[in-house]
Amino acid sequence: MEQLQSLRGMVDLLPAATSRWQWLEQTAREHFRRSCIREIRTPLLEATELFARGIGEATDVVGKEMYSFNDRGDRSCTLRPEGTASVVRAAIQHGLLSQGAQRLWYGGPMFRYERPQGGRQRQFHQIGIEFLGFADPRSDVEAIAIAWDLLEALGITGLQLELNSLGSRVDRQTYRDALVGWLSERQNQLDADSQQRLATNPLRILDSKNPQTQQLLQDAPNLEQSLSDPSRERYEQVKAGLSALKIPYLCNPRLVRGLDYYGHTAFEITSDALGAQATVCGGGRYDGLVEQLGGPAAACVGWAMGLERLMLLLGDESQQSQPPDVVVISQGNAAEALAVPVARQLRQIGQAVDVDLSGAGFGKQLKRAGKSGARWAVLIGDEEASSGQLQRKDLHSGDSSTIALQSLAENWIS
């Protein structure tokens, strides 16, 4: 019978890797706790309309990359391709904004039908924050600072923050008209994807990876030239806030985000730790999204990080599997019957305990215990089972002592 394999782009996380993931997730969780950001968990499966309305039907995500299907009730459903729209939907549905502004974080798997490559899979994992109901430019600064500080806490090196303002809706429409007019006169010089985007999502042309298109864009109208005075002042306040925190930034007038809901502040944090610059965090402000999804008008800002990309940057040494504290070794029927009860007692007092159930001789079991990195081995033979006196061996020094089974938990000293 043919061996079944995981689907392309759907990667198993094996035990050797999960300890590193747990460390990363716990580091982020503690970072968010100290920033007074509460966790929210949303379903993996949502109505397709949520993303069509929230992200934008003209985006690559909605047009090309979503996993969508009709369920048995003929409802169009989609595996979430990103987290923001789901968080906003949940906040609206459960009236969170009626309770005041919300500082939320989320984490978990997302799904996009893309070509798998290093740091990017079809099932991928993100963590992100969403500040809902915060209009002050200082909230943009704080959100960026939280991302920057988390990346530094994780040990990511070579960080660079790129910053832009997409302005208000009116600013973007003014710029869109100017850009479309300029590019239409040079349409034959654009790559095929950019020619298609000219009619559907022209701002995304600024993010083209085609070298010829990027060369052409050097002379294109600049988004900053279309900013109104209030938008320009807001942008200056964000930059001043970052400078006050000594967070270095580079203004990039070509920086746009791939989702339609962004406006005003947009940013990406990259790292050159792997050689080329790789984006590790992206986000910005999305003041119109809550209202667009049927909620009250609310100013919002947030960001997301891809965990697979972070794992590549962290390398193999970021966190190793934790060894057991104790390995319980037994030989003989009476002794083997005690092995699991002894392990259970030790676990109840906080020890990490492995039980060797191989049935091999004491020598082989002790050798395996030593290789495991454990500090202690508890040896139980039939004689120990009969007397109730167990052997405790220090695997670092080789010293042994006896300890009474009846008072094992009370007398155990690590």
Curated annotation (Swiss-Prot):
This enzyme's EC code(s): 6.1.1.21
UniProt xrefs under Gene3D superfamilies: Anticodon-binding domain (3.40.50.800), Bira Bifunctional Protein, Domain 2 (3.30.930.10)
The keyword Protease belongs to this UniProt entry's keyword annotation: no
Subcellular location, record wording: Cytoplasm
A matching Pfam family: tRNA-synt_His
One annotated GO biological process: histidyl-tRNA aminoacylation
GO MF term list: ATP binding; histidine-tRNA ligase activity
Family: Belongs to the class-II aminoacyl-tRNA synthetase family.
Assembly, per entry: Homodimer.
Designated name of the protein: Histidine--tRNA ligase
Source organism (scientific name): Synechococcus sp. (strain RCC307)
Encoding gene (name): hisS
